[in-house]
């Protein structure tokens, strides 16, 4: 069984789109009928995230950690108890392509690290995507770690102790421990998971803060150009 874990804290605006994309990926013919279970960790949610999950018949559980690392770890533990042999991780504001799970299994490695892109639905988000694409590394061997596009075998996950209860960087921490333990890691340039362009995220120091930092850097560079007359 493949287990898909999704941490969520007040994600009513995006969780439906995320789960529908996961359900489509779970039906991909490349999985050859392998069972897929999706679990959403409702971490201190006060909006309608839980109701949307129920409408889509997706399993959930509640916790009050307010910590993305703890939420991922709890969801992973739940899936392992249910017999998962592979754990796939994404974020509640992400959208996965149909071949996402099949590609992770096809990699035939202990861990799968994929890339992400930023959704562009308006002028601001298109600008953010351009900034992100300038800074991101693409293609196989990229060396990036994103919790929104991550997979690991149950055996390798257990061997290194799983996700740590970190408020940020739990994905990077896990992959570092996997690499140190000699696990094989597939740094895949495809498939790409699309994530939101929001600048106010759920975890301090997370992806939204990274995007906000890119915006500030660009604004600072523009200001310098104006002052020096080089822009």
Language-model regions, residue ranges each:
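Acidic donor-binding loop at a coil-to-helix junction in glycosyltransferase catalytic cores
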Residues: 168-174
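Short beta-strand/loop segment that forms part of the nucleotide-sugar
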Residues: 30-44, 61-63
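A conserved acidic beta->alpha catalytic loop
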Residues: 39-50, 94
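A recurrent flexible, glycine/aromatic-enriched loop bordering the glycosyltransferase active site
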Residues: 119, 134-152
């Amino acid at each position: 069984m493949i287990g898909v874990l999704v941490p969520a804290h007040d994600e009513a605006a995006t969780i439906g789109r995320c789960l529908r994309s996961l359900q489509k990926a779970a039906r991909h013919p490349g999985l050859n009928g392998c069972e897929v279970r999706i679990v959403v960790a409702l971490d201190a949610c006060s909006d309608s995230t839980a109701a949307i999950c129920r409408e889509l018949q997706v399993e959930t559980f509640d916790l009050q950690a307010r910590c993305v690392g703890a939420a991922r770890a709890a969801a992973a533990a739940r899936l392992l108890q249910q017999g998962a042999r592979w754990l796939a991780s994404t974020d509640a504001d992400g959208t996965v392509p149909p071949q996402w799970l099949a590609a992770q299994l096809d990699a035939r490695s202990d861990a799968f690290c994929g890339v992400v892109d930023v959704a562009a639905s308006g002028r601001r988000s298109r600008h953010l995507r351009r900034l992100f694409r300038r800074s991101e590394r693409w293609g196989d061997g990229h060396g990036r770690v994103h919790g929104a596009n991550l997979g690991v075998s149950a055996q390798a996950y257990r061997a290194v102790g799983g996700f740590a209860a970190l408020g940020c960087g739990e994905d990077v921490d896990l992959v570092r421990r996997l690499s140190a333990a000699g696990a094989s890691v597939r740094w895949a340039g495809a498939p790409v998971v699309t994530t939101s362009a929001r600048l106010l995220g759920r975890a301090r120091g997370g992806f939204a803060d990274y995007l906000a930092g890119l915006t500030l850097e660009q604004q600072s560079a523009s200001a310098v150009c104006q002052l020096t007359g080089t822009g």
